[in-house]
Structures are given as structure tokens and as C-alpha cells.
């Protein structure tokens, strides 16, 4: 249901906006769910996937495999995971691109900015549904 007059709900426009989105917006669009352990620890459901995160593949041909993220290729919407590869006819290996929706984050690479993002997301989820005004 459309709620805002100036925002389009047309499917073709939403698809165009999604596939033509710039790199800094693709980062948040390429988010994956956290594992149950991390979700209970940080009180956050999902995070953008980043290089050196450890992931579990939960969908597709490589379901059940674990590995470390070696590359997040935003332009192609692809995430490359260590040891998830095939060989070409000449024997050279190439990495299989995965979607963020196929992955669950099991271990995060934390630094200052990522830690602050986790605390901000947890705080906003805690106040969700409450009034923001102070009486």
C-alpha cells in the first residue's frame, strides 16, 4: 500500500533504483543475517557483509560449508568465500560468486566503526515502537 505521495511504488522503478544503486548503498543492501549466537550477543539481526567475516552458507549448492569472506564485489552483487571454487578446463581455479541472502554471519571482523554500528543498531531496536518525545 502506498503511503507517501512523492515515493513511487512502481515495480519497474524500484528495480531500476535497486540495480542502478551506487556502491555506498549497495553495501547496506548486501547485508546478511547474524547467527543465533551473535544475534543474542549483539541484539542485532543483520549486518553488511565485509571482507574477513566468517560465514556459513545456508542456501544453494554449497549449503553447509563455512569459510572466510575473501572479497565483496559490490558492482556484481557478489560475495566470494574462501574454498568455494571450481576449476576451469585448463585447471585454473575460480571463485563462485554468492549472494548475501545465501549466507549467515558466524564471526564478525570488528573495529571501532563496526562496533559503534552494532551499538547504534541495538539501541535503535530497543526503542522501536516507543515515542521519541520526552514528557
UniProtKB/Swiss-Prot annotation:
GO terms for biological process: translation. Residues 1-23 are annotated as: Disordered. Transmembrane segments: none annotated. InterPro entries: KOW (IPR005824), Rib_uL2_dom2 (IPR014722), Ribosomal_uL24_CS (IPR005825), Ribosomal_uL24_euk/arc (IPR005756), Ribosomal_uL24_KOW (IPR041988), Translation_prot_SH3-like_sf (IPR008991). Keywords: Ribonucleoprotein, Ribosomal protein. This is Large ribosomal subunit protein uL24. It comes from the Eukaryota. PROSITE patterns: RIBOSOMAL_L24 (PS01108). The keyword Hydrolase does not apply. GO terms for cellular component: large ribosomal subunit. CDD domains: KOW_RPL26. SUPFAM superfamilies: Translation proteins SH3-like domain. Belongs to the universal ribosomal protein uL24 family. The gene is RPL26. The keyword Hydrolase does not apply. GO terms for molecular function: RNA binding; structural constituent of ribosome.
Amino acid at each position: 500500500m502506498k503511503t507517501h505521495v512523492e515515493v513511487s511504488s512502481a515495480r519497474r522503478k524500484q528495480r531500476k533504483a535497486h540495480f542502478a544503486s551506487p556502491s555506498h548503498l549497495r553495501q547496506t543492501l548486501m547485508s546478511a543475517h547474524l547467527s543465533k549466537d551473535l544475534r543474542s550477543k549483539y541484539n542485532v539481526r543483520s549486518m553488511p557483509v565485509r571482507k574477513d567475516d566468517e560465514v556459513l552458507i545456508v542456501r544453494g549448492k554449497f549449503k553447509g560449508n563455512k569459510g572466510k569472506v575473501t572479497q565483496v564485489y559490490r558492482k556484481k552483487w557478489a560475495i566470494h568465500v574462501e574454498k568455494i571454487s571450481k576449476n576451469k578446463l585448463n585447471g585454473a581455479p575460480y571463485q563462485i560468486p554468492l549472494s548475501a541472502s545465501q549466507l549467515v554471519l558466524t564471526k564478525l571482523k570488528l573495529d571501532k566503526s563496526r562496533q559503534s554500528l552494532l551499538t547504534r543498531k541495538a539501541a535503535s531496536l530497543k526503542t522501536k515502537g516507543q515515542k521519541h518525545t520526552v514528557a
